[in-house]
């Protein structure tokens, strides 16, 4: 018997179905949908594959990040997904857009058996109007999320029961063996990292906001380094928290929502994000109080990588059409696990390209499956290594050209550890200190400050501010 197909349901309808079909789904005290992704609570980069076809083989930087898969193997994985769908009672389909700039917008169709996944992508992408749905037609990309079904390790190129495979030729993604919702959104980011350079535009793993005078700031950083938190500034308008493109006209957000790390979320210092976790939002792998259903944001009993996903409209002042001008300030967020980086440094154009391509930072615990329990130093090119398709220097050259053309200022901001190493009990840079530094960047104070060369690093930093201020 064919499954009942639920197409383009509203958020309340998807919440209702999740509560009916998913045994561990429940409402939080503020109405968000609390869900579990079970065995996989982070991305599975070792199981990511890109199909090696003639149209992309020369563009892709093949290696440990972009591992090859044949077209035949991809078709076998897609068959597993479709066969699984055929055994299910319900199938949820969402038609959405990726990209607020309509010149580069992609039509995306998602197939999934879990209402939570459908609601997640409804939040993370851009929901069409009724008129747009009527003329939606065939999608540009299709995601087959059969995460409850296992991949077949005997398929050539598949090495476990988990597979996240992307085919640029057929414009499809197949997900097997993982129910972690983040695989879908990062799949779309990977697509844009391939498509946008073809048009001369820079795809960025970055957040962005804009001031009242139209000044745009872009924050580059790996997951957990502060992109979502720091871009949600009550004095500025949010453009987006994770995925953007820099075109000839300015910056646009690929997504229609935010996917924030929830562990340690503080309603006093991160009020905008806290208040966004309400009805329509998804709370992924969070622990609830049994009686009150309040989220315990400090509970790591399920995982360290607890997440909340909510639409942009849940943030006061977020741009409904998330398109803005060229960046005045670019901030590289580095999670320094050694505690040796200054709180802030100013970079020249040459230094900016070097640090961008090098991407020194640290893996935040839990973001990837099997990651360490403490922050470990890594080099993630372009502050988005897991999602790059082409060689990092290609994106680095694009950034350098755009920075020079639009006279963008570049800053290196340490959101990592101060006064010691992460593995020896040091604490992360206080959020209030980081916010104060960003405020000083925005109001021009740091541009007029007295700088000196940081010994051994060559970049310039605020005189007398080699370590975290006494306010720490």
UniProtKB/Swiss-Prot annotation:
Entry keyword set: ATP-binding, Decarboxylase, Gluconeogenesis, Glycosome, Lyase, Nucleotide-binding, Peroxisome
GO CC annotations on file: cytosol; glycosome
GO biological process: gluconeogenesis
Gene Ontology MF annotations: ATP binding; phosphoenolpyruvate carboxykinase (ATP) activity
Major location (coarse): other
Nucleotide-binding keyword on record: yes
Record-listed ATP binding positions: 221-228
Leading EC class: lyase
Pfam family, one: PEPCK_ATP
Enzyme Commission no: 4.1.1.49
InterPro entries: PEP_carboxykinase_ATP, PEP_carboxykinase_C, PEP_carboxykinase_N, PEPCK_ATP_CS
Subcellular location field: Glycosome
The reaction(s) this protein catalyses: oxaloacetate + ATP = phosphoenolpyruvate + ADP + CO2
Regions annotated as coiled coil: none
Pathway: Carbohydrate biosynthesis; gluconeogenesis
Subunit architecture: Homodimer.
HAMAP family assigned: PEPCK_ATP (MF_00453)
Family: Belongs to the phosphoenolpyruvate carboxykinase (ATP) family.
Function: P60 has the capability to bind to microtubules and membrane vesicles in vitro.
Protein name: Phosphoenolpyruvate carboxykinase (ATP), glycosomal
């Amino acid at each position: 018997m064919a499954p009942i197909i639920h197409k383009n349901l509203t958020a309340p309808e998807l919440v209702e179905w999740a509560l009916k079909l998913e045994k561990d789904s429940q409402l939080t005290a503020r109405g968000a949908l609390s869900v579990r992704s079970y065995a996989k609570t982070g991305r599975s980069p070792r199981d990511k594959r890109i199909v090696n076809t003639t149209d992309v083989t020369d563009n892709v930087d093949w290696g440990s990040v972009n591992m090859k898969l044949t077209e035949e193997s991809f078709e076998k994985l897609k068959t597993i997904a479709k066969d699984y769908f055929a055994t299910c009672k319900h199938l949820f389909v969402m038609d959405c857009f990726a990209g607020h700039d309509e010149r580069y917008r992609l039509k995306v169709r998602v197939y999934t058996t879990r209402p939570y996944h459908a609601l997640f992508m409804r939040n993370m992408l851009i929901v069409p109007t009724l008129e747009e749905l009527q003329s939606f037609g065939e999608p540009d990309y299709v995601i087959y999320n059969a995460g409850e079904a296992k991949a077949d390790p005997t398929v050539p190129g598949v090495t476990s029961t988990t597979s996240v495979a992307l085919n640029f030729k057929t414009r499809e993604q197949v997900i097997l063996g993982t129910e972690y919702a983040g695989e879908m959104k990062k799949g779309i980011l990977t697509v844009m990292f391939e498509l946008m350079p073809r048009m001369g535009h820079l795809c960025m793993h970055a957040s962005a906001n804009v001031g009242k005078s139209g000044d745009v700031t872009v924050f580059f950083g790996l997951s957990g380094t502060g992109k979502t938190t720091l871009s949600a500034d009550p004095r500025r308008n949010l453009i987006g928290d994770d995925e953007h493109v820099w075109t000839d006209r300015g910056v646009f957000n690929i997504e229609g929502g935010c996917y924030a790390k929830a562990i340690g979320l503080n309603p006093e210092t991160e009020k905008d994000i806290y208040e966004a976790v309400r009805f329509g939002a998804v709370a992924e792998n969070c622990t609830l109080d049994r009686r009150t259903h309040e989220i315990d944001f400090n509970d790591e009993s399920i995982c360290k990588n607890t997440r909340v996903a909510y639409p942009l409209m849940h943030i006061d002042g977020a741009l409904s059409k998330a398109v803005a001008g060229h960046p005045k300030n670019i901030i590289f967020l580095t999670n320094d696990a050694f505690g040796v980086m200054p709180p802030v440094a100013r970079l020249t154009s040459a230094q900016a390209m070097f640090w961008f391509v090098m991407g020194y930072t640290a893996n935040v615990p839990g973001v990837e499956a099997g990651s360490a329990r403490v922050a470990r130093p890594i080099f993630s090119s372009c502050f988005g290594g897991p999602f790059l398709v082409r060689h990092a220097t290609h994106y680095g050259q694009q950034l350098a050209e755009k920075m020079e053309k639009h006279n963008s200022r570049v800053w290196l901001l340490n959101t990592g550890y101060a006064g010691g190493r992460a593995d020896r009990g040091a604490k992360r840079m206080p959020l209030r200190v980081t916010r104060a530094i960003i405020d000083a960047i925005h109001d021009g104070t740091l541009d007029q400050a007295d700088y000196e060369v940081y010994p051994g690093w060559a970049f310039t930093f605020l005189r007398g501010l080699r370590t975290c201020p006494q306010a720490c």
